[in-house]
Amino acid sequence: MTSFNLSQAIGSLKSPILVVGWPGLGNVASSCVRTLINSTNSVVVSALDPRDHFDIEDIEVKNGVCFPGKLPQLLFRIIVTNSDHDLVVFTPESQPQSESMELAHKLISVALSTFNIEKVITFAAISGAVEPEDDPKVS
């Protein structure tokens, strides 16, 4: 099984930073990264194979024949910027069902070897006790 697929050539990136938005709690983190993607000229360049980390959760039936449903995509996008750093953005469509640390290690390994990243920025959300009258904040 191929764990990594490079769909197009990657040119020289300027001191690339890996940005990851993990889905989960209300999709807060992944929404932040999607906003970044949608406000720039990002290009999908590759993907990780989801089969080691996700199970098929549904099926499609066509003309009485069952087909496996789709697995979540684990895409890498490139954003070329006008600053000192270009961005490599990883956007998983779902949290891994198993082997989550293995996926994290694979992600970092591919990002280092393929994109030569220099830094990693991750977005994630966690719930906390907030009273209705409290002002929302980001920590």
Enumerate the predicted regions with their spans:
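N-terminal short beta-loop-beta anion/metal-coordinating cradle
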Residues: 1-94
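Glycine-rich phosphate- or other oxyanion-binding loops that anchor nucleotides, phosphorylated ligands
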Residues: 68-139
